[in-house]
Design a protein with these regions (language model features):
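Cytosolic, low-complexity regulatory segments enriched in Ser/Pro/Gly with interspersed Lys/Arg
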Residues: 2-18, 22-63, 99
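A common structural junction motif
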Residues: 217-224, 476-485
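Short, polar loop/linker segments at the starts of domains and inter-domain junctions
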Residues: 57-66, 422-429
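Soluble acyl-CoA-dependent acyltransferase catalytic core bearing the H(X)4D motif
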Residues: 38-42, 49-60, 73-74, 78-413
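Secreted/luminal cysteine- and crosslink-motif detector
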Residues: 15-16, 351, 443, 460
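Low-complexity, glycine/alanine/valine/leucine- and proline-rich hydrophobic stretches
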Residues: 403-483
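The N-terminal extracellular segments of secreted preproproteins, especially immediately downstream
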Residues: 13-14, 201, 441
């Protein structure tokens, strides 16, 4: 692992502190993962059904809102959780598979929609339907390797892919007639284990997934069902208006002709996943520099800085081409008519979209880009959400649009480590593993269970010949020449 520090000249120029103290401060670390092949044996696969009666019979259906049915939600979100061998004798003797399966079956009584399947109606809209022999898919596997053989477990590694189950020859983005939750438990020779999950985004957003996961983990740990808050389905709260009333342009969904060099640069070779650890001090100073006029959030400043660094590293042309930055905004607290019920676990996110020309990103100031990001975030209101629902109803976009776009996803607002203690302690790592299938996506992750200082990990995919430039721009901070950052 190589530590990247701001140059003493740049750092001193705007921080106003001594060169000596900064030279010892690892504000940005470039993280490296071990290239490995994990050999596993799948021992068995079986459905996990709700352990008690549920309010649905074969043939019943459940409504999904247009927020659940957005084209970007028609995916499975893969995550991996690593648990080290238990230190105490009582925990080490707990049967992992039995506890995880029994507790999941208990939780599925309250979260019964997850035991169904998705299908399309005549107009192409998704719904949940219930049939015989459905349930959640559980996969039990083992490996002769130990967790120590997997390299640094704090850095997302594409080599962990065998630990998250996929069907042979599975079609990309397939969600129809699939189990809505797929869980693979892999037992390692050292006594540790991993839990690889694929959860259908149509059923819940990130906060909804954490609610489900928290209930599962708490039930496993306590040995009795715990589902607080009581889960609430009620997707009809987001019914479209009749007729649909679209009040915003919703450029986040629109197809824009890519008249730039961006797509060719990104896709001409297989992208490489890179991760960087950014300290809380780096984020704080970046936020201070980014808001001379406006009050911004740390995310506003970070998103602006990453976007600018990405565009500069890729040397996008022409300079007058307009680029888009999209990111999800949680709209739960913006809903008042009516407010959401506690326990609602469906999708309540809107896609915010900031736009700026290449020239403005490359030659402008960090404060200008931050302001654009902030305005896009604040533009998400209750009416914006209702307009999004109506836009999807009227247009029903069929494909993801990547033209001129970078998407940043923030996982730091999820209590992903705190929610995942099944009785063996918090996971040593919790999060995604491989971003290379989507090279126009950047993910900001919490640094890990051991970090208590606000450190984040930024993961992004880049062409190999752009990595050094991106690393340089990401680390650069100089108030005397704001166009440098």
């Amino acid at each position: 692992m190589s530590k990247l520090k701001l140059s003493s000249t740049n750092a001193t120029a705007w921080c106003g502190i001594s060169q000596h103290s900064l030279m010892d401060l690892p504000w940005v670390q470039e993280l490296h993962f071990t290239h490995l092949k994990i050999a596993i044996t799948i021992d068995r696969m079986f459905p996990v059904m709700p352990s008690g009666p549920i309010p649905a019979q074969p043939g019943d259906t459940l409504y999904l809102s247009n927020l659940d049915d957005m084209i970007g939600a028609r995916v499975f979100t893969p995550t991996i959780y690593f648990y080290e061998p238990a230190a105490d004798m009582n925990s080490s003797q707990k049967p992992v598979m039995k506890i995880l399966c029994d507790s999941l079956a208990e939780v599925l009584v309250a979260y019964y929609p997850l035991s169904g399947r998705l299908r399309e109606t005549k107009n192409g809209k998704l719904e949940v339907f219930f049939g015989l022999n459905q349930g959640v898919l559980m996969v039990e596997a083992h490996s002769k390797m130990a967790l120590a053989d997997l390299g640094d477990l704090t850095v997302p590694n594409p080599g962990w892919e065998p630990l998250i189950f996929k069907f042979p020859d599975e079609e990309p983005y397939k969600v129809l007639d699939m189990p809505l939750v797929i869980a693979q438990v892999t037992l390692f020779s050292c006594g540790g284990f991993s839990l690889g999950l694929r959860l259908c985004h149509c059923i819940c957003d990130g906060l909804g997934a954490m609610q489900l996961f928290r209930a599962w983990a708490a039930t496993a740990k306590a040995g009795t069902k715990i589902a607080k808050p009581e889960p609430c389905w009620e997707r009809e709260i987001f019914l479209p208006r009749n007729p649909p009333l679209v009040k915003f342009p919703h450029v986040e969904f629109m197809s824009i002709e890519d008249g730039s060099s961006l797509t060719m640069t990104l896709w001409q070779t297989k992208p490489v996943q890179k991760c960087y650890r950014l300290s809380q001090e780096f984020q704080s100073h970046l936020k201070t520099l980014a808001q001379p006029d406006d009050v911004c959030t740390t995310f506003d400043a970070m998103a602006a800085h990453i976007w600018r660094s990405w565009v500069k590293a890729l040397d996008v042309r022409p300079l007058d081409y307009e680029l888009r930055l999209t990111f999800s905004v949680n709209a739960r607290q913006k809903l008042h008519n009516p407010p959401l019920k506690e326990g609602f676990y469906g999708n309540v996110v809107c896609v915010a979209c900031a736009t700026s020309t290449v020239s403005e990103l490359v030659n402008g100031q960090i404060s200008d880009t931050t302001r654009v990001v902030r305005e896009a975030r604040l533009n998400v209101s209750e009416e914006y959400l209702r307009s999004t629902v109506d836009y999807i109803e009227a247009v029903r976009p069929k494909r993801l649009e990547f033209g001129g776009k970078l998407t940043i996803t923030q996982w730091t607002r999820f209590s992903i480590y705190e929610s995942a203690d099944f009785g063996w302690g918090r996971p040593v790592y919790a999060g995604p593993i491989d971003l290379t299938p989507t090279p126009q996506v950047c993910v900001i992750l919490p640094a890990g269970k051991a970090d208590q200082h606000g450190t984040v990990v930024v993961c992004i995919c880049l062409p190999e010949d752009a990595i050094d430039k991106f690393t340089e721009y990401l680390c650069m901070m100089d108030s005397s020449n704001a166009s440098h950052i």
